[in-house]
Amino acid sequence: MKLIELCVLCAIAFAAPRQKRLTVGTIAVTGGVGGASGCVVTGNVLYANGFRLRELSASEQQELTNYEKQVAEYKASVKQILKERQEKLKSRMSGKKEEKAAVTSTKDEDLPKPPQKPSFCTEDDTTQFYFDGCMVQGNKVYVGNTFARDLDQNEIEELKEFEKKQTVYQEYVQKQIQQQVSNLFGGADFFSSFFGDAKDQTTTTVAPVLPEDAPEQPAVPNFCTRIY
């Protein structure tokens, strides 16, 4: 039973949308997952990554109630599917013969979709920008866990532009790394020498298409100054 429950939690974690995560030097941009990270509601008060945001409105409380019901139904469905898979696996291991139709495993894409997050919990609410000396979340500057100030309108626009350019830059860097690793190990031909006859392999590795002009790493916003 514990194994099934663990599988349910893993399925939920992998099915859920991935949080944004960027890094640049001493800066980390992350949506945060697990524990007090992300959105948490207790006593009708909304928290994001451990920081109190506000009280939920009446309509948002109803939205939360509906979400809790959908999550319960989703967990029950995933648990039932995993239980059926476990029973089929036990039957195979015990040597029982079953018809092909009976032993056909459920594909991952056939798993139920997790419920959509409530409208009051968005990526803008949970994304954190860690700079050298401070952190920005929800257009608010924090020093440690202490609220310092709100970003002004110009700083908000600067942060949006930085995030946009940094995303493009990191995607380019990621492709460069993939290409270098592929060239280093010779693509599929390298691994085929271990798992088959290399001379019979016809698969070739196509290098990722990279932009002719590499994007520049964006300048880091100066929202705080660390004194060394």
From Swiss-Prot:
Aspartyl protease inhibitor. PANTHER family: PROTEIN CBG07421-RELATED, PROTEIN CBG13105. Residues 1-15 form the signal peptide. Coiled coil: none annotated. The keyword Iron does not apply. This is Aspartyl protease inhibitor. Residues 88-119 are annotated as: Disordered. Gene3D superfamilies: Pepsin inhibitor-3. Residues 88-112 have a biased composition (Basic and acidic residues). Disulfide bonds join 134-224. Belongs to the protease inhibitor I33 family. It comes from Trichostrongylus colubriformis. GO terms for cellular component: extracellular region. It comes from the Eukaryota. Keywords: Allergen, Aspartic protease inhibitor, Disulfide bond, Protease inhibitor, Secreted, Signal. GO terms for molecular function: aspartic-type endopeptidase inhibitor activity. It is found in: Secreted.
